[in-house]
């Protein structure tokens, strides 16, 4: 049996910690901002510092958030830390008491979740790979519900989770889905989904929160 090195053990412990933090978040009154992940796509290999000013408590981060993340980002999105460890994205999760905006959005049958998200995430500017990672994370929680009330947050979310990136990116896309399961369908004004063109150094974030 292969002996695990210290770095592998730390990664496993961090993953276990994240699982328990999410379970604890589900049991409390706070909303849980689950799996926001941050992708960095510079035009050339670049040293990048990312900081998060969050109106809540960070419960899990990977790699570990130590007064910010400092990584070397490659154009294909690969991130490398000072120890040479590589990552696909920066991950964080937290608890807050933010009241998300449900004044417009979509009421979607659970069985239609995949087709809805594929279309919506494309309109919001995610690549197929980014959308795939979003969908496989949220789909198991949504597909068996009779309906889901889905909204994509803008100012309410970005003010609660302010992102600072150095050097300054040319394009920032932040997709955050607040949603709640429903037994019956409801009427709600539809949102207008748009995205900026992805040009230059691009930063992409996606995440979500199941609201009670």
Give a label for each model feature.
Residues 2-10:
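Bacterial N-terminal signal peptides that target proteins for export
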Residues 6, 26-27:
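Intrinsically disordered, low-complexity segments enriched in polar/charged residues with Gly/Pro
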Residues 9-17:
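Sec-dependent N-terminal signal peptides
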Residues 21-24:
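C-terminal motif of bacterial Sec signal peptides marking the signal peptidase cleavage site
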């Amino acid at each position: 049996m292969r002996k695990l090195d210290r770095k592998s053990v730390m990664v496993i412990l961090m993953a276990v910690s994240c699982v328990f933090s999410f379970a604890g978040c589900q049991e409390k009154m706070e909303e849980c901002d689950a799996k926001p992940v941050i992708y960095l796509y510079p035009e050339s290999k670049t040293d990048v510092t990312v900081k998060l000013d969050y109106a809540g408590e960070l419960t899990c981060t990977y790699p570990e958030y130590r007064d910010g993340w400092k990584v070397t980002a490659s154009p294909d999105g690969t991130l490398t830390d000072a120890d040479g460890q590589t990552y696909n994205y920066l991950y964080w999760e937290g608890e807050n008491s933010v009241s998300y905006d449900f004044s417009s959005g979509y009421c979607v049958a659970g069985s239609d979740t995949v087709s809805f998200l594929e279309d919506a995430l494309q309109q919001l500017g995610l690549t197929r790979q980014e959308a795939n990672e979003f969908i496989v994370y949220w789909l198991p929680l949504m597909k068996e519900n009779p309906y889901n009330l889905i909204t994509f947050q803008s100012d309410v979310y970005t003010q609660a989770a302010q992102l600072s990136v150095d050097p300054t990116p040319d394009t920032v896309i932040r997709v955050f889905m607040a949603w709640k399961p429903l037994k019956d369908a409801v009427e709600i004004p539809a949102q207008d989904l748009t995205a900026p063109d992805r040009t230059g150094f691009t930063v992409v974030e996606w995440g979500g929160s199941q609201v009670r």
